[in-house]
Every structure is written in structure tokens, then in C-alpha cells.
């Protein structure tokens, strides 16, 4: 029988059908991986790393801290069914205890979307954990430290001190702040202060000030899923603390890769402002 050549218009449909047919096998493989026990380090810590001899990174979840009023409160399936991001972990806009100026700024940012991340600036909180290049969490019990590496974009990393130290009293405000951590059962709890007000803690620009006290809770739900929750306690921008979160998925056989933000950024209008109509160097990175 001669080979059948499909018309170009049908080829994308054929590829889609083939991909859908492959989903059950992939889902079955994912179920097998989820059945693997949560790995631990020699000192008893839950491991967020790839098992010895294997590769893998944590893939980003939904990096919004707040969802619109009209969005359905359902669990969205990510990565062809390999994990879910429960939207009920995220508050609706009306439930966030904004101060008036912070609400106004948040709404302004939804229209203009001038995110510092698009200009190669560092991020914090949920946004630092949710990047398109994969996230590495490296645990060094010998040093009593945990590192969270963001190899793409701004090439930044965080150090979480696990040795019981207190926050310094004379911190200079920075994008990442100063982080100390401890374990509550199998949940890593990270306490961070010392932020400046220029970094965004999510992709939609929930405002923060230098009064921000961020508490993050990271739990490996099973082999394939990582629960991330953060509580924002910032009396400069909100009238009460509030919590949001996401679920991240393990991507096996993958590694973080280098992306040079300044050299690789093809959206020059985000770097200097003005779009295709010209360069507006007065456009603020953070209003």
C-alpha cells in the first residue's frame, strides 16, 4: 500500500489525536511515580531534590496570588493530568484585605501589566517559585541551609538558614529579604522579612511594602506534587494577613537551564517601555 499524504490542514488534527491517544499511558506512568514514597535525606529531612542518579525539577504552578471574581473555583488539571492546582487556595479579589491605595495600584497593574520580571528584575514569594525554567531546591544539612535557585530570568537564588538563627535587626531592604526556616512535621516553614517594595510576590502585582512579613509553607504531598502556600502579613498594604498558594509538579528527566534575560529577551518594549510606537524611558518598572 502506498503511503497516504494528508493535506496540510489535517496534519495538526492528526498530531492532536495522536497526543490524546498517548495520554492514558502518560497518566499511568504518573500514577506509578506518585506511588513512590516521598524521599528523605540521611538526616530525616523530607527531600525536595531528585533522588540520587535521577534528574528532575519542580515545574511552575499558577503564579497569581489573587483570582478574578468570575473565575470558577475548580481544580484545573496541569501538564496533561500530571497534577492539579486547586484554585480554592487562592482568594478572590473581593476577599483580599487591600488598603485603598493598594487596591487602586493592584487594579492599575492589571491594565498596564508592567511586571518587573519581564525586565529581568528579581522576584519574591510565589513568583520566585513559579518560573518557566524549572525550580531547584537544594538542601545542605551539613551547612544547615536550603537554597532555592532561579537559574533563568534574573539568575537569583535564596538562602534559607536552618540553624535556628534570628533575623538581623539592621537589615538593608532587598528583593529577596532575609529567610530563616524550620520544620513543622514534614512541612518546611520559611519566615522572611527585610523586603524592599520593588519586587512582586506574584505575576499580577499584589502590592507590598517594606513592612512585609512573609511566611511560606512547602509540603511534598507525594513524589510528584509540591504544595506551596504563603501568608502575606503587610500592615503597610493590607488591613489583615491573607494566604494564597499553588501546587507545583515534578518534571522528571529535566534540568534547569541557563537563560540570559538581557540577551534573550525578545520583548524590548518591556525593557524600555513604549512598545512599537517608540521608546518611553519614563515608563516605571514599578509604579
Predicted features and spans:
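Bacterial N-terminal signal peptides that target proteins for export
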Residues: 1-14
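Bacterial N-terminal signal peptides
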Residues: 11-24
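PEST-like low-complexity, intrinsically disordered acidic/proline/serine-rich tracts
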Residues: 17, 27-287
Amino acid at each position: 500500500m502506498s503511503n497516504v499524504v494528508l493535506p496540510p490542514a489535517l496534519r495538526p488534527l492528526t498530531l492532536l489525536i495522536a497526543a490524546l491517544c498517548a495520554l492514558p499511558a502518560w497518566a499511568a506512568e504518573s500514577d506509578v511515580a506518585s506511588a513512590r514514597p516521598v524521599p528523605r535525606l540521611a538526616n530525616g529531612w523530607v527531600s525536595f531534590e531528585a533522588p540520587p542518579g535521577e534528574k528532575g525539577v519542580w515545574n511552575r504552578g499558577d503564579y497569581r496570588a489573587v483570582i478574578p471574581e468570575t473565575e470558577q473555583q475548580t481544580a484545573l488539571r496541569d501538564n496533561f493530568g500530571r497534577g492539579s492546582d486547586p484554585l480554592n487556595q487562592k482568594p478572590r479579589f473581593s476577599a483580599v484585605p487591600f488598603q485603598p491605595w493598594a487596591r487602586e495600584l493592584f487594579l492599575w497593574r492589571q491594565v498596564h501589566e508592567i511586571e518587573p520580571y519581564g525586565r529581568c528584575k528579581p522576584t519574591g514569594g510565589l513568583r520566585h517559585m513559579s518560573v518557566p525554567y524549572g525550580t531547584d531546591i537544594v538542601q545542605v544539612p551539613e551547612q544547615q541551609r536550603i537554597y532555592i535557585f532561579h537559574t533563568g530570568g534574573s539568575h537569583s537564588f535564596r538562602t534559607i538558614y536552618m540553624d535556628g538563627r534570628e533575623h538581623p535587626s539592621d537589615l538593608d531592604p532587598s528583593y529577596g529579604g532575609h529567610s530563616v526556616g524550620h520544620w513543622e512535621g514534614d512541612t518546611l516553614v520559611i519566615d522572611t522579612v527585610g523586603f524592599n517594595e520593588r519586587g512582586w510576590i506574584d505575576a499580577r502585582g499584589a502590592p507590598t511594602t517594606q513592612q512585609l512579613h512573609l511566611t511560606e509553607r512547602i509540603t511534598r504531598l507525594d513524589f510528584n506534587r509540591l504544595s506551596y502556600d504563603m501568608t502575606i502579613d503587610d500592615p503597610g498594604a493590607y488591613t489583615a494577613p491573607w494566604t494564597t498558594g499553588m501546587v507545583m509538579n515534578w518534571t522528571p528527566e529535566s534540568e534547569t537551564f541557563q537563560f540570559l534575560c538581557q540577551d534573550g529577551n525578545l520583548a524590548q518594549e518591556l525593557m524600555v517601555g513604549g512598545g512599537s510606537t517608540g521608546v518611553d524611558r519614563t515608563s516605571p518598572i514599578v509604579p
